[in-house]
């Protein structure tokens, strides 16, 4: 599967890093807004202030964590594309596993194995769903079979039975 909308590898890393940061800030912002609202003292003004404060403090941190994950994933993916010479789902699956392992390296080998498995499984699921969606949508755009004329709508040939009356023949 080739992805035609993707940037070339050096720019892909920057693009994925920025996209992951944005996704982390937005998703983390929503989550932190709800968390800050629920944990603030009673009163709408206090709850609103707690919500904004939680977003202001935590959303950039979450975005940064997502950016690190996206940048490392994209760097490993580009390295595998260069090493293997082809771009396929196995690169993404391997990149997810290696990214999980590298980011969990400070927690020890057992955490590295667990994170590698989770990263590989997560990316395998994402790639599998992408392949299924691509195949499903490709079926919608297949060429339709040619339209065949209905024989009952054609004009009768000389000496052939009239349409709708199989045993009736004209005599000359």
Swiss-Prot record:
Q: Where are the transmembrane segments?
A: 17-37, 61-77, 113-133
- The UniProt entry's coiled-coil ranges are none
Question: How does this protein sit in the membrane?
Answer: Multi-pass membrane protein
Which key words are in the record? Disulfide bond, Membrane, Mitochondrion, Mitochondrion inner membrane, Protein transport, Translocation, Transmembrane, Transmembrane helix, Transport
One Pfam family hit: Tim17
Instruction: Tell me the disulfide pairings in this chain.
Output: 9-78
Molecular function per GO: protein transmembrane transporter activity
User: How is this protein annotated for GO cellular component?
Assistant: mitochondrial inner membrane; mitochondrion; TIM23 mitochondrial import inner membrane translocase complex
Region ranges (Disordered): 147-172
InterPro entries (UniProt xref): Tim17
Q: Where does the record place it?
A: Mitochondrion inner membrane
Main localization of the protein? mitochondrion
Any one Gene Ontology biological process term? Answer: protein import into mitochondrial matrix
Name the family.
Belongs to the Tim17/Tim22/Tim23 family.
Protein's job: Essential component of the TIM23 complex, a complex that mediates the translocation of transit peptide-containing proteins across the mitochondrial inner membrane.
Subunit info here reads: Component of the TIM23 complex at least composed of TIMM23, TIMM17 (TIMM17A or TIMM17B) and TIMM50. The complex interacts with the TIMM44 component of the PAM complex. The complex also interacts with DNAJC15.
Which protein are we looking at?
Answer: Mitochondrial import inner membrane translocase subunit Tim17-B
Q: Which organism is it from?
A: Mus musculus
């Amino acid at each position: 599967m080739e992805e035609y909308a993707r940037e070339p590898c050096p720019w892909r890393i920057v693009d994925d890093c920025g996209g992951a940061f944005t996704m982390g800030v937005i998703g983390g912002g929503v989550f932190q807004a709800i968390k800050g609202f629920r944990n603030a003292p009673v009163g709408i003004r206090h709850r609103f202030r707690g919500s904004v404060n939680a977003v202001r403090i935590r959303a950039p941190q979450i975005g940064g964590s997502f950016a690190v994950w996206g940048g490392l994933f994209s760097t490993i993916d580009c390295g595998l594309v260069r090493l293997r010479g082809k771009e396929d789902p196995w690169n993404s699956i391997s990149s997810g596993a290696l990214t999980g392992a590298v980011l969990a390296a400070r927690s020890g080998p057992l955490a590295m194995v667990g994170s590698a498995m989770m990263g590989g499984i997560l990316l395998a699921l994402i790639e599998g769903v992408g392949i299924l969606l691509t195949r499903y949508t490709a079926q919608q755009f297949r060429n339709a079979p040619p339209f065949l004329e209905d024989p009952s709508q054609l004009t009768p040939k000389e000496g052939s039975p009239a349409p709708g009356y199989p045993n009736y023949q004209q005599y000359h």
